[in-house]
Amino acid sequence: MKKLKLHGFNNLTKSLSFCIYDICYAKTAEERDGYIAYIDELYNANRLTEILSETCSIIGANILNIARQDYEPQGASVTILVSEEPVDPKLIDKTEHPGPLPETVVAHLDKSHICVHTYPESHPEGGLCTFRADIEVSTCGVISPLKALNYLIHQLESDIVTIDYRVRGFTRDINGMKHFIDHEINSIQNFMSDDMKALYDMVDVNVYQENIFHTKMLLKEFDLKHYMFHTRPEDLTDSEREEITAALWKEMREIYYGRNMPAV
């Protein structure tokens, strides 16, 4: 896409929001409580603040204010307001490619925010526990928040990820013509690294004319030991392993497809 010469500030709002899910099997009530306590501590407000602050560093944003809170009995939220500094538009990379992990992108944000909320969850029947984190990066200016996608998914190791990206508003060029998007995009997947794409099965649902892009990700490899909390698969009987594997896989598919599925 040819670079635009704008009249005034770039008024496009670009929003990236995604849910990540971590699934676990905890055999007893004590193990379920232990998992919730573990995941709640792992992703407490301080840790989330560190992750989001690094995200700001990656995309070149200046932090104006941080609001964070841990909740009882569990959960946390962090919201960061960020601002823009003058930047040479010639230095802005608008091509479709994966964003960096810890590297710096020369770009800045204005009237923008980054926020995360966590939702640990379990049920007394079945032993299944889930952890969900909702993250939103909303920017107003020249850079797309998709540059932060790679880093965030790597930091929050996930079994399932659902991602939405949308562009709203318009900006004008020097001739007064409106532009409703200022960069090329045909898939969120183009902003992911090859190693990430190798780990997940992915499907897109995009509405190009509305500048709405959606990608769902499901971890390809299933290893039962990674889903057990304080229980080793080798300590279970064959039938127990099969039953737990089926329950976990059903849970993951239901979350991935967003609907309840019949028992197989």
From Swiss-Prot:
<protein>
    <recommendedName>
        <fullName>S-adenosylmethionine decarboxylase proenzyme</fullName>
        <ecNumber>4.1.1.50</ecNumber>
    </recommendedName>
</protein>
<comment type="subunit">
    <text>Heterooctamer of four alpha and four beta chains arranged as a tetramer of alpha/beta heterodimers.</text>
</comment>
<dbReference type="GO" id="GO:0005829">
    <property type="term" value="C:cytosol"/>
</dbReference>
<keyword id="KW-0865">Zymogen</keyword>
<comment type="pathway">
    <text>Amine and polyamine biosynthesis; S-adenosylmethioninamine biosynthesis; S-adenosylmethioninamine from S-adenosyl-L-methionine: step 1/1.</text>
</comment>
<feature type="modified residue" description="Pyruvic acid (Ser); by autocatalysis">
    <location>
        <position position="112"/>
    </location>
</feature>
<dbReference type="InterPro" id="IPR016067">
    <property type="entry name" value="S-AdoMet_deCO2ase_core"/>
</dbReference>
<keyword id="KW-0745">Spermidine biosynthesis</keyword>
<dbReference type="InterPro" id="IPR003826">
    <property type="entry name" value="AdoMetDC_fam_prok"/>
</dbReference>
<keyword id="KW-0210">Decarboxylase</keyword>
<dbReference type="GO" id="GO:0004014">
    <property type="term" value="F:adenosylmethionine decarboxylase activity"/>
</dbReference>
<keyword id="KW-0949">S-adenosyl-L-methionine</keyword>
<feature type="active site" description="Proton acceptor; for processing activity">
    <location>
        <position position="117"/>
    </location>
</feature>
<keyword id="KW-0670">Pyruvate</keyword>
<dbReference type="Pfam" id="PF02675">
    <property type="entry name" value="AdoMet_dc"/>
</dbReference>
<dbReference type="InterPro" id="IPR009165">
    <property type="entry name" value="S-AdoMet_deCO2ase_bac"/>
</dbReference>
<feature type="active site" description="Proton donor; for catalytic activity">
    <location>
        <position position="140"/>
    </location>
</feature>
<comment type="function">
    <text>Catalyzes the decarboxylation of S-adenosylmethionine to S-adenosylmethioninamine (dcAdoMet), the propylamine donor required for the synthesis of the polyamines spermine and spermidine from the diamine putrescine.</text>
</comment>
<keyword id="KW-0456">Lyase</keyword>
<comment type="similarity">
    <text>Belongs to the prokaryotic AdoMetDC family. Type 2 subfamily.</text>
</comment>
<dbReference type="GO" id="GO:0008295">
    <property type="term" value="P:spermidine biosynthetic process"/>
</dbReference>
<feature type="site" description="Cleavage (non-hydrolytic); by autolysis">
    <location>
        <begin position="111"/>
        <end position="112"/>
    </location>
</feature>
<keyword id="KW-0068">Autocatalytic cleavage</keyword>
<feature type="active site" description="Schiff-base intermediate with substrate; via pyruvic acid">
    <location>
        <position position="112"/>
    </location>
</feature>
<keyword id="KW-0704">Schiff base</keyword>
<keyword id="KW-0620">Polyamine biosynthesis</keyword>
